[in-house]
């Protein structure tokens, strides 16, 4: 069973809060984009997953493991599951944009709020080196409340990342 937090069943008429952050191609070398970042801590027994793309798009979510090794599960059952990834990219949730300023990384993604709308979520942290980042805060824009998480993510090389094309990010 594959479960990514934030998956929902939106249609074109549903409410979609704007990200408020423009997508810009990432040309830096502060973080690697030829793989994914995996959290060292879990949230409700699910590890955090961040995938960064050179076009400025990101995937930021938690994955549920079905008993396999986490790396094997993420690579085979999540990232290489073409039909699942197609459904994920066609819904406005867990996807967004990122930007890097000096040693700060900011990811803004959508999250499912209720059956008919999404909200923007900010994950902000610091770059330790090109293979390690730490998310310090998560803020939900509608609530104006920050959650301090201090979750370290380590890079895992992976050359077969799924395409990042989505109609929700221009």
Residue ranges: model-predicted function:
Residues 7-95, 101, 106-170:
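Lipid interaction determinants
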